[in-house]
Design a protein with these regions (language model features):
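Conserved beta-alpha junction segments in alpha/beta enzyme cores
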Residues: 1-88, 95-146
């Protein structure tokens, strides 16, 4: 088995609108600054010809349409099985909205969206390039405390 990983900063440049917490009036305005950057992390497991790609980002969620676009793009470009691409979000209510087409606050940014898709592909490429032999083990143990 080989495993590769990648990490990318995904904080947008310029005006950054935040997602989540609908009842805050300032959600309709851009953020006043960046307290902490947001990141994406990826890991690729390879066993023979089989690959499983996990991509996680510090965002609220992935819309189904975006997830479908990502899976199609990775399958067409790199030959990975669509069912072996998993996207997850940290569900961060203070993250960016630029990638989200249908959120009610903030502003969707087509350029950022395309850049984000590109970043996912770059993470896949980096994972493949730095994949190294690894051993995966699974254990289970009941722990009791008083």
């Amino acid at each position: 088995m080989n495993i590769g990983h990648a990490r990318r900063k995904i904080t947008p440049q310029g005006d950054i609108y935040l997602i989540g917490y609908r009842n805050l009036p300032n959600r309709l305005e851009p953020a006043t600054g960046v307290h902490d950057d947001v990141f994406a992390n990826a890991i690729l497991f390879q066993q023979g010809e089989r690959e499983v790609f996990l991509f996680n980002a510090d965002v609220l969620e992935f819309e189904e349409s975006m997830a479908e676009e990502v899976k199609t793009m990775l399958a067409e470009r790199y030959g990975i099985d669509r069912d072996c691409v998993l996207l997850s979000a940290t569900h961060d209510h203070t993250s960016i909205v630029a990638y989200h087409r249908s959120w009610w606050t903030g502003k969707f940014d087509e350029n950022y969206y395309r850049w984000f898709l590109d970043t996912i592909c770059q993470c896949f490429e980096v994972c493949r390039a730095n994949a190294q032999p690894a051993i995966c083990r699974l254990g289970k143990q009941a722990v009791y405390y008083t």
